[in-house]
Amino acid sequence: MLLNDQKFLPINIHYLNQGRFDLNKLKNFNLLINQRENWRFFLINGLKLAFKEFEHFKIKNNNFIIDIVFQEKFLFFKQIRQAYLKKVETFGYNIFIPIIITQKILNKKNNLNLTFFKWLDLGILPSLSPKTSFYIDGISRAVSTQKKKSPGLMFDFDLTKKSSLEKREGEAFLKIIAPRGSWFKISYSEDHIIFIEIRNIAYKIPIFTFLCALGFSLESIFQFFNYNINNFKLIPNKYDNTNALIKARNDIFILYSDLLPLLNKTKKNFEIKYIINHYFFSYIWNSNTRYCGEATRLHLYNKVGSPLSLNSLFLEEIDFIYITKIFIYRLINNNFKDENNDNLKNMRFRNGGDYIYLQTRQGLFDFESFLNINLHNIENNSFFCNITTNKKKEDIYSIKKKKNIKNFNLSKISFLKHILLKSWKSFFLSGTLSQFAENLNPLSYITHARRFTSLGPGSLKKAEASIEVRSINPSYNGRVCPIETPEGFNAGLVHSFSLYSFKGVNGELLLPFYFIYKNIKQSYYLPPIFFNIEEESNQSIITGDLIHEKWNDFLNKKLSLRNNFHLDKNDISKISFQSLSPYHMISLATSLIPFLEHNDANRALMGSNMQRQTVPVLGAHNFIVRTGLDTKFFSDISSIPISQINGFNFESNNNYCYFYKIDNLITLNNISYNYIKKTNHNSLYINESIKKKNPWHQQGDFLINNSVIENGKLALGPNLLLAYLPWHGYNYEDAVIINERCVSQKILTSLHIITLTNSLELAYREINKKKEFFYEVPVKLEILFSFFAPFYYNLKYYKNQEFSQFEKKNPSYYTNNINIGTFLKKGDCIFSKCRIRFSFSRELRLQYKELFILLREAFPTFEDFKNFANIFAYDKYKQKLDRKKQKKNTRLKTDNFIFNKNSTLFKKHKLKALINYYNIEDSTIYAQKNQEGLIISKHLKKVPMTYTSITPFDLEEFLSTKESKKKEYYNLFFTKSINIEILQLRDIQLGDKCAGRHGNKGIISKICPINEMPLLPDGTPIDIILNPLGIPSRMNVGQIFESLLGLAGFYLNETYTINIFDEQFGLEASRSFVLSKLYKASILSNKPWLFLKKNAGKTNIIDGLTGKYFQQPITIGYSSILKLIHMVTDKLHGRSIGGYSTLTLQPTKGKSLLGGQRVGEMELWALQGYGASWALQELYTLKSDLVEARQHFQNYINSFNIESNIYDRNDISLTELESLIISDTFKPYTLECFLEDLKALCIYIDY
């Protein structure tokens, strides 16, 4: 079972008091421990707790009583076998729970009891796999963590409403948040009245009315307030002191005036009080609305001073007296601004186990409602069992069939399995927090698993999120990465956890610190101590990048410390804790960026996101400059096989590694892995075993390499030789120029798999109030037929013919192109099929019947027509080959009829009826341009038809079938479906997007031959040319340090591990280290041009076109280049006819909407520069974005006279042209040529 699997959780967490815990060795911590521990806690405790809340179901009726008791202590998990896992394609566990059912049948004389025990199957619960993902229906899914408001009291302002007090920014309110159920909101209105709102009630209640309804008298309410409250109207004006309680309850009754017609006028006063009390205590003040939980009770004790015990988990009447008192006190003192509600101490985090716990509770609640609805309305005992009176003993009732009771109850109880599965699947398959796992590379997957969002059910909405919510809070330090967040509408709403943040038992974030005692860091003997936010705010903490001596004694006696999230400089004697590492404040993806402190935060954000979007390429290598954290997550996600023993690797193949373990007895161990791995983004990388000269492996060694891993280290892209140089305008605006070597040597080539699924269509629709059914028949020819052919055949002639006879005659006509190993090209036939349409029009049906009765032929069945479709397709192809041999007057003879152009009128009527009744269309699937590739797999399977999309095979049988038996009739049929997987090798091409690790990205604009690229002094051609203007404005200078240090490491054959915030080692430590390595490389490699004293970091390079040196030295280096998933193959499309936006009247955007580009000012420049005058005339006049121009273009299509008008947007271009004229007498020749081109556009300029 999962709970006993030691591989599932490699780390044991020890929980201590005060919500803190520590790890024995923090260096062995797991990055996915939050998800794994949360799921483990759910399986051990959460699932049992959900069943314990619904432990006893009791359904009572006048005739019977049924008790259902769950024995949750004996909950059993059964692991799915590997063979069955391939069938269901869902990783999970079969869950069984024992139940005890007791049924009591009530009779006039005796009560009959029946009790039995059964293990109830709850179905397959999708479980967390060892890779920390949910594998459902063959697809890997990840569940995001959600940030929600913590249960408790929240004081805040509503800035969207006006305040009734002076100097107040918005309406003040107090909200009581419960872990589940309702919440209470107390607000202060413009009329100086305090109201209370309830979540499930759509109106506001005055607080005094609410307190009176709880049973407090007027005197008891006012004796709690010992300060001036004249400015606050607790009692509205329409109430007086004598009958306040009665009118308060009448006010509640008026809100429910719909009950007035049901009252008896003679007993109105009594019934009013009864209905008010019953409604109030049933819907407003019940156990669900009063539940507050432990956290809310603790807030009531600390913030309000409620005298009730902390063990009281429900709101009481006295709580609202203290809540109203503190609310008025804060209004008087304007003490609402001190509350920082966006602080993480007021937030809680939920993982996948918490969601499934809530879904299980919801499923059990739905099951309880299902039992009440289905079993409460049964009035006759005979429905359960047959009870008869014994003639000899009239007082004794005997049950004829006891199994009826048991079977009936079990049939209803078995619905619990379907209800729970529906509840679980609704979360995993349609929930907003369950998403496709971003497993494009290992970094993208582990980042997706460590991400949390403020959106989702019960939380914020994207459109309503303010800037305050999206901004960075001081409490994020060390717990939430301030850099990594998406760009666009989700900015600030989706974040990533910092490297060392852990989630505690109650959902709050914890952070480890080293203890400092007497100026010495206690990191050797004492494990790190974990603090929550409130505990951390009371400590004096220093950062983890400070230098200390050999014995952990700090050098500086005055250090910058953090106390209550405020920075200050104080003596070292007042410091109590230190952060673990400089990396504690950033996330995993951000920590992989070298020289991070030299980059702007916005560009670091882009660099973090683009590393996740990297496609595995064939020429990827390890980073020359790395941070040292790129090997950590491979072992944490358990996706890479690791040697579990110390042994001798004597054999390795594509799927296994065999080891000999040498001890007293030589034993054999084998480790399996997948040779080919496909991602959810249709990318692919191939695993290959590591071949070493020394076959000995230590425990923990990585065993395979692929496109993202090389010798156990991350390899996202190749290390290319780059130069920062403007080159003939091709790298303008961040465009990128690459060497042709990157294409020919497959350096930036990626593997992709495209899955094509084609099935026989079964559809139904109504056209002009006529029912039509469609069914598709597979045929075996590439060239199909059109129904309106010169020859038609009698269906009866082919009724008893076998299609295999026609195959044997011409087997070459039936060659199948869909074979594994063949290369699919554009236009190739993927799946040959034709569509048959049945019309249920009564007139056509009667006409068709009369025709066949007149011809004395039997009504054709659907199988006959399928055979006819295949034969007709074959004969159509045969006619095309034999057309030259046949004469024009040749007639094709069949059983009874001769079809030619001179057919009789009677025969024409028959053909017309066939065309109207059976309509055959070509629905063959042909390969598109983006579907070209190598076919690697083909699966043909039968899929059962669904009840809603069935086409009847036999019309007569279908129409004669009763409605009650149609479902059985449908289950007899299946349809065919074919799945084809195509492997594509995508070379880098124009339009593809590439980037670095520092947020420097660009589009490939030109692929230059090797002989045209700039050269180093030793003749080495440059691989990639970047625009130097992209560095100063973006302020990401870290890429310069990486490229220069990579250049030194290439010639020294070294790799470097860089720590962030290296200013602790001295002023300009990064610059000094990089230049020293460059100087060393120039000496050891005997290449003095690597380090020029006057221009350190730059080199004189040669122009490949002229063979001469450039006038100025150029910055060169080796840097890791990433190929992103945004490839032009997936995005390029052509727009011929498309939609226009309603508001802007511009073409829609995007490939899915058939969008296009409006021809504006910049497009005009491009067409002018290219010299496309006639295309410019058409696009800039007739096809412009004006409605009038489109009307002119329509007139042009309809052969009407058209006019070429000049629109207002041409004024900008005309003004620019006027600025080109220096004087009236001098006109350059090029300008005169340009003015001549403008005449073709109907644009005339007189000078």
UniProtKB/Swiss-Prot annotation:
Q: Does this entry carry the keyword Plastid?
A: yes
Documented EC number(s): 2.7.7.6
Pfam families listed in its UniProt record: RNA_pol_Rpb2_3, RNA_pol_Rpb2_6, RNA_pol_Rpb2_7
The SS bond pairs are none
Q: Name one GO cellular component term.
A: mitochondrion
- Top-level class of the enzyme under EC nomenclature: transferase
Report keywords, A-Z: DNA-directed RNA polymerase, Nucleotidyltransferase, Plastid, Transcription, Transferase
Where it sits in the cell: the answer is: Plastid
Give one GO molecular function term. Answer: DNA binding
Q: Which family, according to the similarity comment?
A: Belongs to the RNA polymerase beta chain family.
Q: How does it assemble?
A: In plastids the minimal PEP RNA polymerase catalytic core is composed of four subunits: alpha, beta, beta', and beta''. When a (nuclear-encoded) sigma factor is associated with the core the holoenzyme is formed, which can initiate transcription.
Question: What role is this protein assigned?
Answer: DNA-dependent RNA polymerase catalyzes the transcription of DNA into RNA using the four ribonucleoside triphosphates as substrates.
Annotated protein name in UniProt: DNA-directed RNA polymerase subunit beta
Question: The organism's lineage?
Answer: Eukaryota, Viridiplantae, Chlorophyta, core chlorophytes, Trebouxiophyceae
Encoding gene, per UniProt annotation: rpoB
